């Protein structure tokens, strides 16, 4: 869960560079179990972000099996945030997608 929040925070850094008038939309590709977690977290984050920046943000979700979701991203699904629950799926994102450093497990134990 901490990794999920860290990834979401990373995506937010990218939002800071968005033009003030732009509507920002994030796509979070996640595994099924997190559906209820984000159902509660996303509205709280949208409010927090609006209060802090004055900007609107919309969060879209894509849920599925972790391995299926990882494969979708490697195959071209343009995710802003990726939350996986299996280390082999994160390894796939590193090896085939180049989306995370190969040493991610040492950097984020």
Language model features with spans:
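Sec/Tat signal peptide C-region and signal peptidase I cleavage site
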Residues: 18-22
């Amino acid at each position: 869960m901490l990794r999920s929040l860290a990834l979401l925070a990373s995506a937010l850094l990218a939002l800071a560079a968005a033009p003030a008038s732009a509507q920002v939309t994030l796509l979070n590709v996640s595994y099924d179990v997190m559906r209820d977690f984000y159902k509660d977290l996303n509205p709280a984050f949208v409010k927090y972000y609006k209060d802090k920046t004055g900007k609107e943000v919309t969060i879209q979700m894509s849920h599925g099996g972790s391995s299926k979701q990882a494969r979708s991203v490697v195959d071209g699904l343009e995710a802003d945030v990726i939350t996986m629950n299996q280390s082999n799926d994160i390894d796939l994102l590193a090896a085939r997608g180049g989306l995370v450093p190969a040493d991610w497990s040492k950097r984020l134990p």
